[in-house]
């Protein structure tokens, strides 16, 4: 019976651990996909300061509306 409890207590991860996108260390479940709160906050800071941006082509910025509205 004790062996059954031990086998049931083992938890299998749903996905393989991936490296942290900031520093390359193995990711932590609590801070996924980062390894620590420090790396998570560093990434958030880059988003908030505009360091990350989605490039937009010039012709995409001038949207043409069928009704002539802007």
Swiss-Prot record:
Binding sites annotated in the UniProt record for Zn(2+): 20, 23, 35, 39
Positions with biased composition (Basic and acidic residues): 1-15
Region of interest (Disordered), ranges: 1-22
SS bond partners: none
Cofactor note: Binds 1 zinc ion.
Cofactor(s) in the UniProt record: Zn(2+)
The keyword Repressor is assigned to this record: no
GO biological process: regulation of DNA-templated transcription
InterPro entries linked to this entry: DNA_gyrase_inhibitor_YacG, Znf_NHR/GATA
Entry's family note: Belongs to the DNA gyrase inhibitor YacG family.
NCBIfam families noted in UniProt: PRK01343.1
Assembly: Interacts with GyrB.
Function: Inhibits all the catalytic activities of DNA gyrase by preventing its interaction with DNA. Acts by binding directly to the C-terminal domain of GyrB, which probably disrupts DNA binding by the gyrase.
UniProt protein name: DNA gyrase inhibitor YacG
Organism, scientific name: Rhizobium johnstonii (strain DSM 114642 / LMG 32736 / 3841) (Rhizobium leguminosarum bv. viciae)
Underlying gene: yacG
């Amino acid at each position: 019976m004790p062996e059954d409890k031990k086998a049931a207590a083992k938890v299998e991860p749903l996905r393989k651990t991936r490296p942290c996108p900031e520093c390359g260390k193995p990711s932590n479940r609590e801070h996924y996909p980062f390894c620590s709160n420090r790396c998570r906050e560093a990434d958030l800071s880059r988003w908030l300061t505009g360091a990350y941006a989605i490039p937009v082509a010039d012709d995409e910025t001038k949207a043409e509306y069928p009704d002539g509205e802007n």
